[in-house]
């Protein structure tokens, strides 16, 4: 959602500010990791795939690499994954609500409502383990 200047690396325009926030950097990591907790066949889900066979790093590998690069102590990202999933549930519900009200901004808004339940179930499953 950014337009770059073709002659340089300067940003000419930012097109989407609604989710633009300055927050804890671990929240970005939680967002990056959430697909590992969503079952395959669901929206962007990786859970159930053989990640090693697909050459996709595990959660532990990603967290270790992230912490190494950021020079921070390795930590459990569960809180941030749950936060990200909860945030996505709210976004998906909002898109679906706009569809129901006839104000959708996406041609697949009707289908997005189907994604709420798998996200909610994945989130609940993680929370139960805490």
Name the predicted role of every residue range:
Residues 26-70, 84-102:
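Active-site activation/catalytic loop segments of kinase-like enzymes and analogous catalytic loops
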Residues 11-14, 58-73, 118, 123:
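Short amphipathic alpha-helical segments and their helix-coil junctions
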Residues 21, 51-54, 108-111:
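Pocket-edge positions in alpha/beta enzyme catalytic cores
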Residues 72-84:
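All-alpha amphipathic helical-bundle segments outside canonical DNA-binding/catalytic cores
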Residues 1-27, 31-33:
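Active-site acidic catalytic loop and adjacent metal/ATP-binding pocket
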Residues 41-45, 75-76, 108:
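Short, hydrophobic secondary-structure boundary micro-motifs
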Residues 94, 98-130:
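Regulatory N- and C-terminal appendages and interdomain linkers associated
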Residues 3-12, 71-74, 109, 128-130:
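Conserved NTP-binding catalytic cores of kinases and kinase-like/nucleotidyltransferase enzymes
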């Amino acid at each position: 959602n950014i337009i770059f200047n073709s002659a340089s690396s300067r940003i000419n325009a930012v097109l989407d500010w609604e989710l633009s926030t300055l927050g804890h950097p671990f929240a970005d990591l939680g967002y990056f990791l959430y697909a590992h907790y969503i079952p395959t066949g669901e929206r962007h889900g990786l859970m159930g795939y053989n990640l090693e066979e697909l050459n996709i790093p595990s959660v532990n590998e990603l967290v270790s690499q992230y912490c190494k690069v950021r020079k921070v102590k390795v930590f459990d990202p569960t809180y941030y994954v749950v936060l990200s999933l909860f945030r996505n549930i709210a976004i998906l519900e909002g898109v679906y609500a706009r569809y129901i009200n006839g104000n959708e901004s996406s041609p697949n808004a009707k289908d997005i409502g189907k994604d709420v339940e798998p996200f909610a179930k994945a989130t609940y499953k993680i929370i139960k383990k805490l």
